[in-house]
């Protein structure tokens, strides 16, 4: 009967049944008959229509065998399916649905032996099935997802119904689940969007890796690396003889398992499971699929959040962040190193996205703290995150900080008067504050790796851009506010702006601004980890320029003391970390040009051979880089703070530290603004009524003089000893401020500004009797600064490893010739000396800077109003030269050199005398630069040299041209002024025809080799240029020259022509000149102390071309 039944069976069933060997019921480790299996595979490959019939028959037989617990038959069936999948991998789609149904039947049997036997079959299925089939058949997709879910449940550490099982049996179940997960993680189906099962398998993997032991992950990682190393050595080992007896002991049992206790054996088994879970995790992250890495990271972060919500500790925080550790930090760093280099950044981006999705609530602060900590650990590690958008991460962290500020705002909390609630609220606030501090440090960690040259500068700029002044601080900010009046006191809090849209865009509250400034400090500290005192000149990035701080001076006027101190800390950190010796070279800082301006300049340079008037029009349309006003505004704010917060000793100490650090790091670039302001502050001591306040302001002034003597190393000179002796005398008399010392104290040692300290126990009677001797020898002080500055530039380098002391480029961007560059590099520009010797007043400086900012806000128009810019540059007379803007603007605080403790009445009288001395006519070119009357008389002026005219026509303005006071750098003149060496050789103040001029006083030791210190208008009143026109008629075609003292630091045509003669004399013989002209005398000789302008004018022969067009005479050569 059985034979008849076998003959009636279809052939595919007969071939399948022949593969099952004869075994007893309950037998395990049964294998199919090899010859019959081979023929079945041949039959299936030659007849593809039979594949589905074979699968259906195996499914039916498996259900019967599982029901009857025929484990041997089930094992044979699974091995037949594995062989079919391997043999028919191109047609695996035909049998894949039946494989999934059979696996589902086996998994639901709840028999660990059969489930372990199904693992090779499932591995073959994952390796050979077509992932595209998942997109085509939704039923098949659901079957696949269900199988993955069932296998993943096996790996759970808290599976229901297994609590009563022994530890070895539990380990078997978890091993089976992890083996299946490893097969899934290496499959292509997992990489597809549809087949992604990260939310199913990742939690099971992480459950097997979770441990309260801090070093558990490190042990597993170390064991994994050792096993991989052994596997690699086996693959590279040469083939051995079959007769060789294996003696390496590689498969010997672990000694702990043989001699240890049951607890040791269980611990070893747990490690084995952990190693397998670690292999599964690695197989997920080593795949170069960005979507898979992102999904796995999101699942990991969700697991971490769940553990935090359950009260588990995933991170351990320390004051020293390098000691921070924990399970979350360890696993996050491990997966980051496993991920491909080009895809690592997705791990950090996923963490940031998860952080931003967490609602800003008190209950979620611990989750946010854990995520911020693991992000910081990754950012400051040696893992390179190529492709990461640093600015996007920065803005995301700033957004999270604003959410926390909104949570901490008073409007978001209610006070019900409950003591328990108040204590809980205090704890939450402390936790919130700690989280904000961690976010600040995380922002700083972004600077660990620099991926492009301007990254650090861009990060600092992005934060500064979001520091918005509040209503209260904007009232007090200089230069718009009043110096005195009903201002908010130092203890007043900033107006809290609770509008949600303002929170979304700016740090509107004082705590937010202080936090943003602390983040800037952290960025600068992290970007320069090994900063030396000599400056980090071997940087692979661009240093943060000074123009980044443009417009931030108002932060020093913030009513909140924490904001003021945070701002000072940021500035001092920038000075210490981002400046070098090159920052001490006297240079006019320029703000970066806009892209439209750069485009204009390119268009202008492309037409260099066009007519000069066309090229000039290009320059008029394109805006030039405007000078930076940061240092000028900063010293103005320091002046205001010194007088407003004189009641608080801490504020004055902090101001001393800031002023000292500016001088020590920027040298004369800071002293040009600081010295006039300090002398004005020293004069204001006389107007202060309280003796205690007088002592404090006087100590601040002498502390600045002390800093200058230390910086420029003239403390051994007479003025240096005078300064130190006065400081020592005041300290001895106890009329000094503790903290104003050299070197200055650290900012960490100083308290919060605005906090009242106990008043010093000073005797008021002795204060009235004692004298605070001011330091009046200002001119000698400036000369010492200038002399030491020259010596520092001329000094050779100290060692082969130190940077060269000579600057490599021209100073002030001047267009000097190659023969004059070496001298100009070691000479201090005249405008710096004038600033240090000039008068300074708060109101005039504020008005000048406000006018400059107002004119800059115009839409690129180059009209008459551009003369009121007052940019702190050598090219602008509006502020640095004669103190007038456009001839009739407000008086400059830097316009006078007589600021040696003079009374205010004389100062005002001189300012009134100065008004009206400069004609208000605007000059646009070299042909109209002689006098204002030239326009009305029809004379076009005189071209001093044909060389100058050739340079103008070719589009290259000569480096030495003329201009009257009131001209500026707006581009209206075809030839713009630049600093040149001839400025140092021509001193009109020493002319004999003006013996009574107060500006003709010689300064010892400098008149023979330095430029004029008095190129501003004479204080005693200058002759009117209109009256001077008819003064000399001996040379009719040549218009009379304006008074040289009225040029405000700019060159005259005679001066430019004289210097052009000198340059020609270096290149060609004087015999080649025309005999009609006279050879001018050189004014650069050391013997000639004065020069006669009339003799120089007579040297220009105008007779041969007296009646020519425009009175243009014959060139004198």
UniProtKB/Swiss-Prot annotation:
Task: Name the GO cellular-component terms.
Answer: plasma membrane
Q: Which intervals of the chain are annotated as region Disordered?
A: 473-494, 601-625, 792-822, 853-1117
| The encoding gene | EFR3
Polar residues bias locations: 601-616, 856-868, 982-1009
Where is this chain compositionally biased, Basic and acidic residues type?
A: 908-918, 1076-1092
* Biological process (GO), any one: protein localization to plasma membrane
Q: What is this protein called?
A: Protein EFR3
Name the family.
Belongs to the EFR3 family.
Q: Where is the signal peptide?
A: none
Pfam name, any one: EFR3
């Amino acid at each position: 009967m059985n034979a008849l039944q076998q003959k009636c069976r279809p052939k595919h069933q007969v071939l399948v049944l022949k593969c099952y060997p004869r075994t007893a019921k309950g037998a395990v480790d049964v294998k199919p008959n090899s010859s019959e299996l081979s023929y079945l595979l041949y039959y299936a490959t030659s007849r593809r229509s039979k594949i589905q019939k074979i699968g259906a028959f195996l499914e039916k037989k498996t259900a019967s065998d599982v029901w009857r617990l025929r484990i041997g038959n089930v094992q044979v069936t699974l091995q037949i399916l594995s062989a079919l999948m391997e043999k028919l991998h191109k047609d695996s789609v035909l049998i894949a649905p039946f494989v999934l149904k059979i696996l589902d039947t086996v998994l639901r049997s709840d028999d660990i032996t059969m489930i372990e036997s199904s693992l090779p079959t499932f591995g073959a299925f994952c390796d050979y099935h077509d992932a595209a089939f998942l997109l085509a058949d939704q039923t098949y997709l659901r079957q696949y997802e269900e199988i993955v879910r069932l296998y993943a449940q096996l790996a759970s550490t808290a599976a229901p119904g297994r609590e009563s099982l022994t530890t070895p049996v539990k380990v078997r179940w978890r091993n089976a689940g992890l083996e299946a997960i490893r097969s899934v993680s290496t499959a292509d189906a997992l990489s597809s969007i549809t087949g992604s099962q990260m939310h199913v398998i990742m939690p099971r993997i992480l459950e097997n890796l979770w441990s309260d032991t801090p070093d558990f992950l490190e042990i597993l990682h170390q064991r994994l690396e050792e096993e991989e190393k052994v596997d690699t050595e086996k693959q590279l080992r040469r083939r051995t003889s079959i007769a060789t007896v294996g003696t390496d002991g590689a498969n010997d049992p672990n000694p702990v398992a043989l001699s240890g206790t049951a607890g040791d054996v269980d611990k070893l088994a747990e490690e084995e499971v952990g190693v397998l879970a670690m292999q599964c995790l690695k197989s997920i992250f080593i795949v170069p699929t960005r979507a898979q890495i992102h999904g796995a990271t999101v699942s990991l972060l969700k697991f971490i959040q769940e553990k935090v919500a359950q009260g588990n500790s995933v991170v351990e925080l320390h004051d020293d962040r390098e000691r921070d550790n924990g399970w979350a930090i360890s696993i996050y760093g491990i997966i980051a190193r496993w991920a491909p280099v080009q895809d690592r950044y997705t791990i950090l981006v996923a963490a940031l996205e998860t952080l931003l999705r967490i609602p800003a609530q008190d209950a979620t602060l611990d989750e946010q703290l854990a995520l911020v900590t693991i992000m910081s650990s990754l950012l400051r590690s040696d893992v390179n995150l190529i492709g990461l958008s640093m600015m996007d991460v920065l803005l995301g962290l700033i957004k999270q900080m604003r959410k926390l500020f909104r949570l901490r705002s008073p409007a978001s909390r209610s006070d019900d008067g409950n003591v328990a609630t108040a204590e809980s609220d205090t704890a939450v606030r402390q936790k919130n504050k700690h989280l904000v501090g961690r976010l600040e440090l995380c922002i700083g960690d972004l600077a660990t790796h620099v991926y492009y040259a301007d990254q650090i500068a861009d990060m600092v700029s992005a934060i500064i851009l979001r520091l918005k002044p509040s209503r209260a601080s904007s009232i007090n900010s200089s230069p718009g506010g009043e110096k005195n009046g009903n201002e908010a006191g130092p203890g007043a809090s900033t107006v809290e702006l609770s509008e949600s849209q303002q929170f979304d865009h700016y740090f509107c509250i004082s705590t937010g601004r202080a936090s943003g400034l602390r983040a800037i400090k952290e960025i600068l500290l992290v970007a320069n980890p090994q900063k030396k005192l000599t400056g980090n000149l071997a940087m692979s990035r661009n240093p943060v320029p000074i123009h980044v701080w443009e417009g931030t001076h108002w932060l020093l006027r913030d009513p909140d003391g924490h904001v003021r101190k945070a701002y000072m800390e940021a500035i001092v950190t920038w000075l210490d970390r981002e400046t070098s010796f090159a920052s001490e070279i006297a240079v006019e800082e320029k703000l970066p040009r806009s892209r439209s301006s750069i485009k204009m300049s390119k268009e202008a340079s492309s037409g260099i051979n066009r007519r000069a008037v066309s090229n000039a029009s290009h320059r008029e349309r394109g805006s030039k880089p405007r000078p930076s006003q940061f240092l000028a505004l900063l010293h103005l704010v320091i002046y205001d703070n010194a007088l407003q917060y004189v009641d608080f000793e801490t504020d004055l100490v902090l101001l001393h530290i800031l002023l000292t650090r500016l001088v020590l790091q920027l040298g004369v670039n800071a002293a040009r603004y600081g010295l006039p302001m300090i002398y004005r502050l020293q004069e204001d001591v006389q107007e202060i009524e309280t003796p205690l306040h007088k002592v404090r302001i006087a100590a601040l002034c002498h502390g600045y003089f002390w800093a200058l003597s230390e910086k420029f190393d003239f403390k051994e000179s007479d003025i240096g000893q005078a300064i130190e002796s006065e400081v020592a005398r005041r300290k001895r008399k106890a009329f000094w401020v503790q903290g104003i010392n050299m070197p200055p104290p650290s900012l960490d040692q100083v308290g919060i500004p605005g906090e009242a300290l106990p008043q010093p126990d000073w005797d008021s009677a002795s204060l009235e009797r004692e004298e605070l001797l001011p330091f009046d020898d200002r001119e000698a002080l400036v000369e010492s600064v200038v002399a030491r500055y020259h010596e520092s530039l001329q000094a050779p380098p100290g060692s082969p490893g130190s940077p060269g002391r000579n600057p490599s480029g021209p100073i002030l961007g001047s267009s000097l010739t190659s023969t004059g560059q070496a001298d100009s590099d070691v000479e201090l520009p005249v405008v710096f000396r004038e600033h240090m010797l000039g008068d300074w007043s708060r109101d005039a400086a504020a008005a000048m800077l406000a006018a400059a900012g107002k004119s800059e806000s115009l839409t690129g128009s180059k009209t008459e109003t551009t003369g009121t810019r007052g940019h702190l540059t050598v090219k602008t007379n509006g502020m640095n030269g004669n103190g007038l803007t456009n001839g009739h603007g407000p008086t400059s605080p830097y316009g006078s050199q007589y600021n040696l403790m003079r009374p205010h009445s004389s100062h005002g009288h001189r300012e009134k005398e100065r008004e009206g001395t400069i004609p208000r006519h605007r000059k646009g070119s070299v042909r109209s630069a002689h006098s204002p009357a030239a326009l009305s008389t029809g004379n076009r002026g005189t071209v001093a040299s044909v060389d100058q005219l050739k340079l103008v026509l070719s589009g290259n303005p000569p480096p030495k041209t003329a201009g009257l006071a009131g001209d500026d750098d707006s581009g209206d003149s075809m030839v713009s002024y630049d600093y040149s060496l001839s400025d140092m050789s021509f001193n009109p103040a020493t002319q004999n025809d003006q013996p009574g001029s107060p500006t003709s006083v010689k300064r010892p030791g400098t008149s023979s080799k330095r430029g004029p210190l008095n190129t501003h208008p004479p204080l005693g009143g200058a002759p009117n240029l209109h009256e001077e026109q008819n003064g000399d008629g001996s040379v009719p075609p040549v218009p009379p020259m304006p008074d040289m003292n009225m040029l405000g630091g700019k060159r005259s045509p005679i001066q430019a022509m004289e210097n052009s003669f000198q340059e020609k004399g270096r290149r060609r013989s004087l015999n080649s000149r025309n005999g009609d002209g006279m050879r001018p005398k050189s004014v650069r000789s050391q013997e000639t102390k004065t020069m006669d302008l009339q003799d120089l004018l007579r040297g220009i022969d105008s007779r041969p071309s007296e009646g020519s067009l425009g009175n243009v005479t014959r060139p004198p050569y």
